[in-house]
């Protein structure tokens, strides 16, 4: 596929910056997003580290650094610097705005997932290894389950 899959790196960065500045926002964000909804690997592992810190009771530069080191992240300094950069670049810390940033990230994640599922279905239809009914059922299941991050084709 030559086209880039849907993503909004600014929204991802805004979500991370918001949670880093106010860890109480993690619950708001976690109700919408999963770690795998982030497009960039750096964003995914920072979100994972934020989650671990929040669940441990404190998210700050010291606990984040320790969590990144504990999880074996070789680019700990880059992760810390990026978290601070994301916090400084945050357009708004209002709960409604942060919720909207999270929804944008989720929307892009669902779109990526559906595009990949449809491409998989197109491949199955081309090579005729599955019946049309099986592929159609798989597509319908993928669409129904895409927002929950579950489901697959046939």
Task: Give each language-model segment a name.
Residues 3, 7, 17, 127, ...:
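A general boundary/transition motif marking the beginning of the first structured unit of a protein
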């Amino acid at each position: 596929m030559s086209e880039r899959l849907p993503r909004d790196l600014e929204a991802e960065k805004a979500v991370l910056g918001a949670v880093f500045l106010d860890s109480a926002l993690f619950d708001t964000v976690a109700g919408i997003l999963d770690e795998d909804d982030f497009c960039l690997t750096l964003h995914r592992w920072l979100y994972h580290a934020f989650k671990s810190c929040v669940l441990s009771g404190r998210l700050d530069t010291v606990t984040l650094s320790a969590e990144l080191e504990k999880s074996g992240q070789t680019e700990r300094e880059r992760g810390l610097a990026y978290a601070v950069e994301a916090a400084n670049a945050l357009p708004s810390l209002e709960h409604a705005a942060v919720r909207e940033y999270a929804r944008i990230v989720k929307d892009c994640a669902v779109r990526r997932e559906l595009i990949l599922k449809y491409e998989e279905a197109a491949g199955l239809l081309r090579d005729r290894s599955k019946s049309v009914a099986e592929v159609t059922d798989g597509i319908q299941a993928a669409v129904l389950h895409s927002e929950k991050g579950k489901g697959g084709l046939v």
